[in-house]
Amino acid sequence: MYAAHPIKPLKAPKLKTKFLRRVFVGASIRRWNDQACPLEFVELDKQAHKAMIAYLLAKDSKDRGKDLDLDLLIKYFCFEFLERLVLTDIKPPIFYALQQTHSQELASYVAQSLQDEISAYFSLEELKEYLSHRPQILETQILESAHFYASKWEFDIIYHFNPNMYGVKEIKDKIDKQLHNNEHLFEGLFGEKEDLKKLVSMFGQLRFQKRWSQTPRVPQTSVLGHTLCVAIMGYLLSFDLKACKNMRINHFLGGLFHDLPEILTRDIITPIKQSVAGLDNCIKEIEKKEMQNKVYSFVSLGVQEDLKYFTENEFKNRYKDKSHKIIFTKDAEELFMLYNSDEYLGVCGELLKVCDHLSAFLEAQISLSHGISSNDLIKGAQNLLELRSQTELLDLDLGKLFRDFK
């Protein structure tokens, strides 16, 4: 916890509680609800899976020498995710048809609905322009491909469950056709590389691990959905902290991948980690070995380097020197004062830890507000509020985000 510089008064984050509640609505939006699903798919999980796939496609494109702006990719991903949250009641076939005839009206409605929530971070005019006239550039092609690949991953489960149900074959053919149209983006990545397909499937399986699994809760967010919440919070709060472009990107990706090792060891609950002496360090060592055997062996050296940077010591403040060696700073103030420029590829682990706690706090508080309660949820929310209600980072009053949800 860091006190503000005495000369500067504390600033309130521009992140709105209304916006955070909207993001969590994504965990209640059922997907494929007109199909016989063997399990429940929700929008928040699909969007997180889409973001992970988009990262792999973007990294592969950059490795093949293509010019690509990751910050723009993340911003456009956020635009598409928010559009889906606002227009949740429109079924995809109708939505795509309306986009052909009423794209400007739909875009204006989305922007108007989000005006009070995101105008401090994004230009509403840029949002409207993007949603009504998506530019035909590599970033949007990657997002489209990631969207269809994540949808295919879900629908393959439905298809194998009941391939003869009405309309199922037509949906499968349409998704396969869309992926075929963008297969040039999968060159050297998916194609015949079964190992990478397994990795993407492994990412998707994080949706099966539920958070707070020992207590009833609504909505029942997954580890996968939680990672996207942390990523978006970290990305947006980077603007409040005036983080450089690469640090902002790293906060999104660091949030997105911070729980990836948990699919290999399962989500061992924090009280057990903290109560058994030496257990947490032992788990970390096991996670490293499992990541090497089951993740890093499937990906390029560049992706390996990124994932290690985002999953090992994920909540420590760090940057990379000229030789790409990871250096840890003594605190966030040192990181921002000396290494807040793109060349250092900095990560404020403290910020991501606060976002991780904020996501957990909201999971508990939102369930309690729905009337779904348990001692674990009540105690968990109280403990997080006590821990974080006065948290400050540089001159930013992050505790306000917790106090506003009391």
Model-derived segments and their meaning:
Residues 1-406:
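Alpha-helical, largely C-terminal catalytic domains
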